[in-house]
Amino acid sequence: MEFVVKSAKASTQKTATLILPLGENCQLGSVAQSVDSASAGALSTALKRGDIQGKPGQTLLLHGLPGLKAERVLLVGTGKADELDSRQWRKVVNAALAVIKNLGGGDAAFAMQDVQVKGRDSYARTRLLVEIVADGQYVFDQFKSKKAEPRALQKIILLCDKAEQAGVERAAREASAIATGMAFTRDLGNLPPNVCHPTFLADQARQLSKAYKGVKLDVLDEKKLRELGAGAFLAVSQGSDQPGCIIVLQYNGGKKGDKPYALVGKGITFDTGGISLKPGLGMDEMKYDMGGGASVLGTLKAVLELQLPINLVCLLACAENMPSGGATRPGDIVTTMSGQTVEILNTDAEGRLVLCDTLTYAERFEPRAVVDVATLTGACIVALGSNTSGLLGNNDELIQQLLQAGESAADRAWQLPLFDEYQEQLDSPFADIANIGGPKAGTITAACFLSRFTKKYPWAHLDIAGTAWTSGGKEKGATGRPVPLLTQYLLDRING
């Protein structure tokens, strides 16, 4: 998908479809009024028929209006001006996209420059529009014998005021990169687990390191992990015939000597629960348990597309959690890379086991801050549903940076407490720590566990169990979240 920014008049723009906003009660904005004048009042005449009222997401497609170079005009309702927020804006853009992607002509022009979205300037409004349109074109049909028909829509023209053109161009460029990262994340998540295993993810990382400059790859195999004393990680991977690994990607786009930011992703490519076996219903969706690792790779891809001037290290904790004669048992005690011992009471609480050793390994990079991303707990879905990611950590400034990034990127998170009182739930009579803390506050106690291994740097934990994929039905599939949040967080570190 190509995005082109122009400061041309809407009435003189040659395009297959010109998209114009329509406010509540058929209110035409300044741009739409100029188009109405150029077409000898054709818009006003069409509105008198009462086919559209301007409510959010309503559409009316008009053909062959006089005086215009556009073949069609699509009116899209934006509702009441004082109620148009990011959520409504998404509804508006998706409504337009639903129409234009089924039309011929190959292009469409958005003339939305006079629309005001609460809390968003022209840059932020445009960036969200481009992300929605690009992500809305996503198709996953790699394993279909009959592929989807090629999309007719190939180019989007973004009309803007001359004074805002530079900002809109930057928005389109950044949004396109984020959408590319989201698509990569979605592809990895949607792949079947017999294809996407730890070695496959390492191969994907290798291809990424070869495709872009400034990237260094290191894959820590199980032999190396044994040498490092990664007993918690190996306790998870030992039940599978697929060997586990920690994938380390270093991108040095910033100044030499600047400490890097670090992203750590949970990459459990299939989670049966191990000996603590999950129920069979819905287990197929446990291929998405590598959503944290996939989103870290997707974020890195967005960073590489933009060649951001930042130093970044990405670590993926990749393993399968399978039952077998060699699998870890409930009650086993292992020694982590940090030297702390863990009593494994439930083998289905495996994500924190691979993450704790990976978080310890991250210390050697002396990071400015570490953000780990994981489909960690079902409890987070109970608490926050599928709209919002859970956020916890040991540094208030970092937490606020991530919350703000989520708001800016329309990919929101919500902070949960990490009070010391919760730590007591992880007490074990036989080891330093247990890997579960009972039925209460599951998301919090999982983060409490990770906090034991993150004392040497500012750290935050994103629980994306509810946001990484859409469960069941025709819309089932990976979402690409939280690539927008993470990319925005890194952009803010540069711009800040």
UniProtKB/Swiss-Prot annotation:
PROSITE patterns: CYTOSOL_AP. Binds 2 manganese ions per subunit. Its cofactor is Mn(2+). The active site is at 278, 352. Mn(2+) 1 binds at residues 271, 348, 350. One of its GO terms (biological process) is proteolysis. It holds the Pfam family Peptidase_M17. This is Probable cytosol aminopeptidase. The gene is pepA.
